From Swiss-Prot:
Bias-annotated ranges (Polar residues): 594-608
Cross-link Glycyl lysine isopeptide (Lys-Gly) (interchain with G-Cter in SUMO2), sequence positions: K79
Entry coiled-coil feature ranges: 85-112, 323-358
EC number(s) on file: 2.3.2.27
Assembly behavior: Interacts with CTNNB1.
Record protein name field: Probable E3 ubiquitin-protein ligase IRF2BPL
Source species: Rattus norvegicus
Gene that produces this protein: Irf2bpl
Location of region: Disordered: 94-131, 162-331, 502-544, 572-692
CDD domains in the cross-refs: vRING-HC_IRF2BPL
């Protein structure tokens, strides 16, 4: 036996493409042996459905009428499916008809004169008919007759489209489409820009394993039966595993005969298009403009037809059941957000009185944590999912201890409020993993907070708020764990503005009056839901919308001009004239929309612009008092900007961040707008603004002695950008700590490195350079 014969004997034919393949190119995990090319093309989650469709087509068309090889024998344990009674009757009739034709041909041959060594070309097919592929493999006479009849039908209808209807009296084999496959289950190949068919895609391993086991045992338990023959005739019904059908088919009525749409079917959902009374069989709509529903009739007669709709949207929209699930999920999300806003409103309404009556441990913890807000948090598994913590409160049930409640906005600037860490972590997990079924045990294990904005020092929120702190058994960890407040300039308003949706319009700009409190608890949520669901006529809806926009316009100017002052007050900072030891005043609302940084379209244009208001507030932060010796550091750009009437460029506006002092004192005071806007208020300076762009625009100063730094030679802490030290102060700090051991930041703190809890320390080479002596270089010139 030659090598070619050995190679050919080892080859195995694919059940779908009938091409000889080597054993390594075959896959035996399905009900029929198929090659890897077919599996990759069709997809492992759809291959079993394609195999079942091909099996029905081969059975209906008499098996391999094109003369192809019948393929390999089935694997051990696979039982052949017997033909139905209707198929057997049709095959017997076709066999009898073929025998009569053969007898007539033999009689004609006997009547014609025999010619030796010559055969006329015109009589060759009649005298010596070419053997078909079925005769080569010795199939049964019934199958051969069925194949011959199917071949005759195919020759007549191969290039006819749509296929002619098949009457009940004729053969049950349906006419084929131009590609040789019949019915909508022929799976015409999709165009590159079209999506896959809307099947219930599951894991390839689970679906293939389940279907292969069921097929090899010879049973059809758990399969969906009752689907019509792909040809539309009275042939065998299609049996499909339920995990390969869309959810719309599984959830629909059992009497509806539905077939999955072909690959190339597009268009949006439309109403079912029943077949007209005179249309025999109601052929399936395989092509057409968008909006045409794919309808399949289950009965070939013209008297009655059952039509079912397969709704497939353009660009692969989900079935109706999934869309309804999305709508329910969206409705639940709106209700949850309304309830969270109601809780926030209840928490902010009487905060000063309620906090004063709480135990000392609870009050101190809340004051400390409120002084850190707002600060950013992110999802541990996906760092692009950002939110911000902006408020804290303590709640207690009857007979239970106090428990910490925190309010988180996610995404930042969206106005969506979550009243627990687990709630926002679950939403982040769903946005990241697209998994709506799993819940997270503790959100504090999945959230990270940034200790200082821009430093990259992200730490686990569970380390800042362990269980003992959340139940007020212990105090808040040290100042090195507390985050520093940061207010994003792109969305300076906090979600506390959302609680003023149902309040009356605020006072005119500059008065500082606050609108009355909103309804609390169940009432606020009910009012929001009632407003959403009330079926008002269009006129009343438009008038209500205009009224709401007018209220927003009236509140916008006051809110924009006092945005920074109010948000700092909302964080729990002491206001001017307020005692630092007592509880903070209740945070006022900021306006109806937290992310509105531009006025409404029809807002009055005669007031101060929002950028000018923000600049005026930022200008008052130009002078900072040192927490050590009281020597002031003036920002020349800020003072020049206040003393000049020239317009200010947006590039010089500082970032809206609020930073705590190094010694952990969080009772920072707030700088109000300039005296020209509020003549009765005194200017108050924050304790320290070390790394704002406005401070950096002035001369560099040492953090310890506040002397002018040398222009190129100074010590910069890699963890905290505001820690800048001159060589003399650094030398004294190194000597005080001892040059032989670990020498940490000259500020006296153990500043952790970015992304870890390991504190930064000097290297020996750096210590040697600093202790070597003064470096004589010129100092920065005064501007």
């Amino acid at each position: 036996m030659s090598a070619a014969q050995v190679s050919s004997s080892r080859r195995q034919s694919c059940y779908l493409c009938d091409l000889p393949r080597m054993p390594w190119a075959m896959i035996w995990d399905f009900s029929e042996p198929v090659c890897r090319g077919c599996v990759n093309y069709e997809g492992a989650d759809r291959i079993e459905f394609v195999i079942e469709t091909a099996r029905q087509l081969k059975r209906a068309h008499g098996c391999f009428q094109d003369g192809r090889s019948p393929g390999p024998p089935p694997p051990v344990g696979v039982k052949t499916v017997a033909l139905s009674a209707k198929e057997a009757a049709a095959a017997a009739a076709a066999a009898q008809q073929q025998q009569q034709q053969q007898q007539q041909q033999q009689q004609q041959q006997q009547q014609q004169p025999q010619q030796l060594n010559h055969v006329d070309g015109s009589t060759k097919p009649a005298v010596l008919p070419a053997p078909s592929g079925l005769e080569r493999y010795g199939l049964s006479a019934a199958a051969a007759a069925a194949a011959a009849a199917a071949a005759a039908v195919e020759q007549r209808s191969r290039f006819e489209y749509p296929p002619p209807p098949v009457s009940l009296g004729s053969s049950s084999h349906a006419a084929r489409l131009p590609n040789g496959l019949g019915g909508p289950n022929g799976f015409p190949k999709p165009a590159p820009e079209e999506g896959p068919p809307e099947l219930n895609r599951q894991s390839p391993n689970s679906s293939s394993a389940a279907t292969s086991v069921a097929s090899r045992r010879g049973t059809h338990s758990g399969l969906v039966t009752g689907l019509p023959n792909p040809g539309g005739g009275g042939g065998p019904q299609l049996t499909v595993p339920p995990n390969l059908l869309p959810q719309t088919l599984l959830n629909g009525p059992a009497s509806a005969a539905v077939l999955p749409p072909p690959h190339g079917l597009g268009g949006s959902r439309g109403p079912p298009t029943p077949a007209p009374p005179g249309a025999p069989g109601g052929p399936a709509c395989l092509g057409g403009p968008p909006g045409v529903s794919a309808t399949v009739s289950s009965a070939p007669s013209s008297t009655s037809s059952t039509v079912a709709e397969v709704g497939v949207g353009a660009a692969g929209k989900r079935p109706g059941s999934v869309s309804s699930t999305d709508q329910e999920r969206e409705l639940k999300e709106k209700q949850r957000n309304a309830e969270a806003l109601a809780e926030l409103s209840e928490s902010l309404r009487n905060r000063a009185e309620e906090w004063a009556n709480k135990p000392k441990m609870v009050r101190d913890t809340l004051l400390t944590l409120a002084g850190c807000t707002p600060y950013e948090v992110r999802f541990k598994k996906d760092h692009s999912l950002l939110g911000r913590v902006f408020a804290f409160d303590a709640v207690s049930k009857p007979g239970m201890d106090y428990e910490l409640k925190l309010f988180i906005e996610y995404p930042t600037g969206s106005g969506n409020v979550y009243s627990s860490a687990s709630g926002v972590a679950k939403q982040m997990y769903q946005d990241c993993m697209k998994d709506f079924g799993r819940g997270l045990s503790s959100g504090f294990k999945y959230l990270e907070y940034e200790k200082k904005h821009g430093s990259g020092d992200w730490r686990l929120l569970g380390d800042l708020l362990p269980e003992a702190v959340r139940f007020f058994k212990e105090g808040v960890p040290g100042a090195d764990m507390l985050p520093q407040p940061y207010l994003d300039a792109s969305c300076p308003m906090l979600p506390t503005a959302l609680v003023s949706l149902s309040r009356a319009p605020s006072a005119p700009p500059g008065t500082g009056a606050l609108p009355p409190a909103a309804p609390t608890g169940r009432g606020a949520a009910a009012s929001l839901r009632k407003r959403k669901a009330s079926p008002e006529p269009p006129d009343s809806a438009e008038s209500a919308l205009k009224l709401g926009e007018e209220q927003q316009r009236q509140q916008w100017m006051a809110n924009q001009s006092e945005a920074l002052k109010l948000t700092m007050s909302a964080g729990g900072f002491a206001a001017p004239g307020h005692a630092a030891g007592g509880p903070p005043p209740p945070p006022p609302p900021l306006g109806p929309h937290s992310n509105r940084t531009t006025p409404p379209e029809s807002a009055p244009q005669n007031g101060p612009s929002p950028m000018a208001a923000l600049m005026s507030v930022a200008d008052t932060l130009g002078t900072a008092h040192s927490p050590k010796d009281g020597s002031s550091v003036h920002s020349t750009t800020a003072s020049a900007r206040r003393n000049s009437s020239s317009p200010v460029s947006p590039a010089s506006v500082p970032g809206q961040r609020r930073l705590a002092s190094r010694n952990g004192d969080l009772n920072l005071q707030v700088a109000p707008p300039p005296p020209s806007a509020h003549p009765g208020m005194d200017q108050v300076h924050p304790q320290n603004i070390p790394d704002s762009p406005m401070a950096n625009s002035g001369p560099l100063c040492c953090t310890i002695c506040h002397e002018r730094l040398e222009d190129t030679h100074f010590v910069q802490c890699p963890s905290v950008p505001s820690h800048k030290f001159c060589f003399p102060c650094s030398r004294e700090s190194i000597k005080a700590q001892g040059a032989t051991g670990e020498v940490y930041c000259p500020s006296g703190e153990k500043c952790p490195l970015v992304g870890s809890n390991v504190p930064w320390a000097f290297m020996q080479g750096e210590i040697a350079t600093i202790l070597a002596g003064d470096v004589k270089v010129k100092k920065e010139r005064d501007p």
